[in-house]
Amino acid sequence: MRLLVISGRSGSGKTSALHLLEDEGFTCIDNLPVKLLPALIEQIGDAPHASKHKFAIGIDARNLNSDLSQIESLIKDNLPANAECLVVYLDTSREVLLKRFSETRRKHPLSDQNTGLNEAIAKEKVILEPVAAAADITVDTSHMSLHELRSTIKRLVVGEESKGMAIMFKSFGFKYGVPVDADFIFDVRCLPNPYWSPELRSQSGLEAGVIEFLNSQQEVDDMFDDICAFVQKWAPSFQANNRSYLTVAIGCTGGMHRSVYLAERLAAELKKGYANVQTRHRQLEQKPGA
């Protein structure tokens, strides 16, 4: 039996994630009271051919605080030995949530006559802290389109069954904020910057000119060697601990040159030992026309 618990802040994409999982053959139950988890786990565990069943359960902040604080123990104490459970938490920045609710004009579940949108968002974050702490996977959807969210959930949650631990190398620009879903963050702003070469400024770390420039820098080789050695040393420990994913974020100033180049180079090296290695370039995806 495979059980996924999908939670997160309202507006972060929980419903969209459940719709995708339903398309992938999961039986989905949304807004389940946490205190009913043990009974549900027992019931689906006793069903015929239970080992082949796949369930996804949506849990939100409308549960009692005391119930949410017990979510980790409720799962651990009631899950059958032959079952697998993964808790996925979707997070989004306050600014993006305010924008999303303003644009859609949807009512926040915790807002009322006495609670405005800003206060409801802050209140929900506190209520869901026990779930966020218990999460096996945290996905920051602040900068994701619906298509990107579905692709990410499919890659990390649906696709990880047969491919083992997924290793994601994510490039980003520090000027746009640090990704909250990273397990490790490496700052490469100290490296020579192609941005200061006028002929390279408009290119990205995927293009030949930038690659040639960075390939010629000894500091870049040293940084690559050190990050690669770190990931290669510790990735087996994460995998042995039944982790389904490992996200390594590489950041430069604008997220266009150095971080992109290193993320691609690191992914190419790690693919020699791992079947499920991907890259994501946050700032490239946000360029006009991307």
From Swiss-Prot:
Q: Which species is listed as the source?
A: Saccharophagus degradans (strain 2-40 / ATCC 43961 / DSM 17024)
The terms under GO molecular function for this entry are: ATP binding; GTP binding
Q: What does this protein do?
A: Displays ATPase and GTPase activities.
Binding residue positions for GTP: D60, A61, R62, N63
Record-given protein name: Nucleotide-binding protein Sde_3181
- Residues binding ATP, per UniProt: G8, R9, S10, G11, S12, G13, K14, T15
Q: Which UniProt keywords apply?
A: ATP-binding, GTP-binding, Nucleotide-binding
Q: Which HAMAP family match?
A: RapZ_like (MF_00636)
Concerning InterPro entries, the annotation shows:
P-loop_NTPase, RapZ-like, RapZ-like_N, RapZ_C
Q: Which family does it belong to?
A: Belongs to the RapZ-like family.
What is an example of a Pfam family matching this protein? PapZ_C
Q: Which NCBIfam families match?
A: PRK05416.1
